[in-house]
């Protein structure tokens, strides 16, 4: 079993981006769990839109990471090239947060479920805020990368940060194809039959419609059996 972002899962299955020419197809979807939002965080008041990132120092995640490709997708939707239009920095979440705190970068791409602790801290201590995407560019992004969903981060998620429109990918459980069908069935059943007793904040986002909504990688037979019992037909190999 493993936990992945839906976009990275698609890269692996299709042999694209960081898996270019090396497809991995011996796994299946178990369930989608919750959304992980692409959050563009900045403390620079001159940055109002993604277009304003041109000429700025921007952390776009570790090279080859899921965040890196999310950043490239969004920059590309706005006609920006990460090699020529921005001063790209390749930092993970923690280093990006530290660099924003110290004023060493202008903005950072963070892909994680909101609220994210690092952004909460920056919003409180530095007045950081999030950059919104506009519908026109979201639509262009979804044409080439259908695993993105439009997502609105509500006002109040972070102190002083207004409602922000962005895109999100899914956090997904996957399993090797050779994992026993009954074991996978029991895992999915245990999660969704006991969702009300789960302590993590993200548990409130568990939803069968969402869990059964993955289309880019087929479902494991054990998961498909559980969803069929609940009235959902999902693709299998």
Positions of PLM-derived features:
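Stable alpha-helical elements in mature extracytoplasmic
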Residues: 5, 9, 26, 49, ...
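Bilobed "Venus flytrap"/periplasmic-binding protein-like clamshell domains
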Residues: 35-102, 213-222
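Ligand-binding clefts/hinges and TM-proximal coupling segments of bilobed small-molecule sensing domains
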Residues: 56-57, 63-73, 147-218
């Amino acid at each position: 079993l493993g936990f992945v972002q839906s976009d990275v899962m698609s890269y692996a299955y299709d042999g694209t981006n960081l898996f270019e020419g090396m497809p991995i197809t011996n796994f299946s979807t178990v369930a989608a769990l919750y959304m992980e939002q692409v959050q563009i965080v900045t403390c620079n008041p001159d940055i109002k839109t993604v277009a304003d990132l041109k000429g700025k120092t921007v952390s776009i995640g570790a090279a080859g990471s899921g965040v890196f490709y999310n950043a490239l997708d969004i920059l590309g939707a706005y006609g920006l090239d990460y090699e020529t239009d921005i001063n790209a920095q390749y930092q993970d979440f923690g280093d990006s947060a530290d660099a924003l705190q110290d004023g060493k970068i202008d903005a950072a791409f963070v892909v994680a479920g909101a609220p994210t602790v690092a952004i909460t801290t920056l919003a409180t201590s530095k007045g950081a805020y999030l950059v919104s995407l506009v519908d026109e560019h979201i639509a262009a992004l979804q044409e080439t990368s259908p695993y993105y969903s439009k997502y609105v981060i509500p006002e109040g998620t972070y102190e002083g940060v207004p409602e922000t429109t962005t895109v999100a990918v899914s956090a997904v459980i996957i399993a090797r194809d050779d994992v026993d069908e009954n074991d996978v069935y029991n895992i999915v059943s245990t999660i969704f039959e006991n969702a009300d007793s789960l302590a993590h904040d993200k548990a409130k986002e568990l939803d069968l419609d969402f869990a059964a909504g993955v289309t880019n990688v087929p479902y494991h037979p054990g998961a498909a059996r559980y969803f069929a019992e609940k009235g959902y037909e999902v693709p299998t190999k």
